[in-house]
A protein has these predicted regions:
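A short, conserved, highly charged catalytic patch centered on acidic carboxylates
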Residues: 1-78, 85-114
Length: 114
């Protein structure tokens, strides 16, 4: 699922492969974790996190909680969750605390300009 979604981001949404890292290590509560995909800006700032699950795994609150915990480290505006069959994207407004679910996965350019 991770490879397919990464290819989708590159081929369909114009994400630069050079700014995408898979299985990116992070420390959370003194424990080593890995996010599936992290997208960066050219400046090196993290911009989006992707959590991938197997097609047999239902996307539920626990999956969103997992990627939200990872985001405590990165504080990116965009979180993507996919099981290869369903894709979700939410945008976080850190000033208001509002979480907005988007109807589609944004292009890389729109990710940077919003």
């Amino acid at each position: 699922v991770r490879q397919h979604f990464a290819r989708f981001l590159v081929e369909e949404r114009n994400y630069p492969v050079s700014l995408m890292m898979t299985e990116y290590s992070l420390m959370l509560n003194n424990m080593s974790r890995r996010c599936d995909i992290i997208m960066f800006e050219r400046s090196g700032a993290a911009r989006a996190l992707v959590e991938c699950k197997a097609p047999t795994v239902k996307i539920n609150q626990a999956v969103f909680d997992q990627v939200a915990r990872y985001n405590l480290v990165f504080r990116v505006e965009y979180l993507f969750v996919t099981n290869g069959l369903q894709h979700y994207c939410c945008k976080i407004d850190f000033e208001t605390g509002e979480i907005i679910f988007l109807p589609d996965i944004p292009t890389y350019d729109s990710l940077l300009t919003s």
